[in-house]
C-alpha cells in the first residue's frame, strides 16, 4: 500500500512539511520530475535486464555494498526473505514455507485472527526459526499499526462499528475506510491511547508476539500519517501526525525489546517519513525499512492466480523518487528491503537486478502473498 508521488505531494502540502520529498542525503522532489532522468533510468534498467547473464548478475550483486550490512541491526545479515500473510495454518502450508532457504520470513500471527484463536503461533514460529540446513532464520510478525482490521480478535463485533462516509466508527479513533480498496481495513487515530493500549504494555500485542518467539515486527500503514482523514483528526487533536507516528514506532520497539533485547522493527512504505521528522529522529527507532511497488505492483485484493495482482509498472518518476528516499535510509546504515509484485518475464529479473545493484534486499511475489513466491531470488 504505497502512495503515488502526486498523492504524497498533496498530503505533504496538507501537513505543511517543508522537508517532504527532499531532505538530507537525497534528491529534491523537483529533481525527480525530469522526464529525461526517468527515461534514462528506465532505459538503463531495461538494458541491464536484457543483457546480463546469471553469472554477471551474481557478480554485480556481490560487488555492491549491501545497505546496513555492517550495522548493528539484528537484520544486518539477512540477504533473502519471504513475505507470506495467508494460508499458513496447516502443517503442509507451514512445511512448504519452512523448506525454503530464506534468511527471514514475514508472516501473520495466526491466533490474532477471529476463529483462529487456538492456532499454535508459537509452535509455527519455533518451526520456522530453523532452516533445513540447521542454520537460524529470522521470523517477523506482520502487524498493521495504522489501521484497525475488523477480522482481528481485538475487534469486538457487538461494540466496534465501521466508519461511514460522514462519521467515524466506534470507537471513534476508527476514522475512515482504506483508500486503496482493502476490505475490512480502517485507518485510525494511532496516537489515541485506546489504540496504543492494544499494542503496548506487558499484556499488549507486541509483548505477546515477542513471547511467542517472533524476532520482530513488520509495520504496515506507517503511511497513515499522510491520509487526509488522519491529518484532519490530528489537526483537531493538536497532534503532529508524523511525529506521533515515530513516537508510536519507538514505543512498539521498546515494548518488544523489554522481552527480547534484539527485537527488530521494520517499517513498510512511507519512505518520506525520514524527511518529515529527520533522520536523527526516525532511524534510531528502526532496524530496517521495506518498500512495496518500487518497480511493479498489483490490485488490492487480487487472488494468487489473478493476473491483476502482478506486473503493473510503477511510473518511472515515482520509482526514481522512491529509490532516492530509500537511499537516505541506506546512507543512515539501515537495511533496505524491497517487495514487488511481478510474474511475467523479464520483470522479476529487472527487479532483482536493479534492486541488488542499489544495495537493497529484493523479493518478487504476487500481491495476495498467500504462497511462497514462484519467482524466488535464487532464480535470478
Residue ranges and their predicted role:
Residues 320-380:
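Substrate-binding cleft of secreted/luminal carbohydrate-active enzymes
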Amino acid at each position: 500500500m504505497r502512495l503515488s508521488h502526486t498523492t504524497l505531494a498533496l498530503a505533504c502540502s496538507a501537513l505543511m512539511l517543508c522537508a517532504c520529498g527532499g531532505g538530507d542525503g537525497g534528491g529534491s522532489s523537483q529533481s525527480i520530475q525530469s522526464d529525461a532522468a526517468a527515461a534514462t533510468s528506465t532505459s538503463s534498467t531495461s538494458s541491464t535486464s536484457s543483457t546480463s547473464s546469471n553469472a554477471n548478475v551474481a557478480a554485480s550483486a556481490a560487488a555492491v555494498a549491501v545497505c546496513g550490512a555492517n550495522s548493528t541491526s539484528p537484520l544486518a545479515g539477512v540477504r533473502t526473505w519471504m513475505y507470506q500473510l495467508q494460508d499458513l495454518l496447516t502443517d503442509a502450508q507451514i512445511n512448504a514455507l519452512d523448506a525454503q532457504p530464506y534468511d527471514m520470513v514475514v508472516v501473520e500471527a495466526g491466533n490474532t485472527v477471529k476463529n483462529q484463536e487456538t492456532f499454535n503461533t508459537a509452535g509455527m514460529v519455533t518451526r520456522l526459526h530453523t532452516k533445513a540446513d540447521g542454520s537460524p532464520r529470522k521470523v517477523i510478525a506482520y502487524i498493521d499499526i495504522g489501521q484497525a482490521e475488523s477480522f482481528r480478535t481485538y475487534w469486538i463485533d457487538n461494540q466496534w462499528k465501521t466508519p461511514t462516509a460522514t462519521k467515524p466508527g466506534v470507537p471513534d479513533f476508527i476514522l475512515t475506510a482504506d483508500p486503496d480498496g482493502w476490505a475490512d481495513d480502517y485507518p485510525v487515530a494511532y496516537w489515541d491511547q485506546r489504540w496504543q493500549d492494544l499494542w503496548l504494555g506487558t499484556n499488549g500485542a507486541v509483548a505477546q508476539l515477542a513471547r511467542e518467539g517472533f524476532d520482530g515486527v513488520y509495520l504496515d500503514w506507517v503511511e497513515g500519517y499522510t491520509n487526509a482523514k488522519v491529518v484532519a483528526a490530528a489537526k483537531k487533536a493538536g497532534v503532529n501526525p508524523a511525529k506521533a507516528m515515530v513516537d508510536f514506532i519507538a514505543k512498539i520497539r521498546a515494548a518488544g525489546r523489554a522481552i527480547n533485547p534484539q527485537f527488530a522493527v521494520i517499517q513498510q512504505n512511507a519512505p518520506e517519513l525520514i524527511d518529515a521528522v529527520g533522520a536523527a529522529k526516525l532511524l534510531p527507532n528502526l532496524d530496517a525499512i521495506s518498500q512495496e511497488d518500487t518497480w511493479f505492483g498489483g490490485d488490492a485484493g487480487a487472488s494468487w492466480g489473478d493476473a491483476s495482482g502482478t506486473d503493473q509498472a510503477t511510473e518511472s518518476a515515482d520509482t526514481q523518487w522512491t529509490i532516492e528516499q530509500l537511499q537516505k535510509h541506506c546512507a543512515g546504515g539501515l537495511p533496505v528491503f524491497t517487495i514487488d509484485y511481478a510474474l511475467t518475464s523479464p520483470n522479476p529479473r529487472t527487479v532483482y537486478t536493479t534492486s541488488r545493484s542499489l544495495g537493497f534486499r529484493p523479493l518478487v511475489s504476487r500481491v495476495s502473498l498467500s504462497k511462497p513466491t514462484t519467482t524466488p531470488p535464487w532464480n535470478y
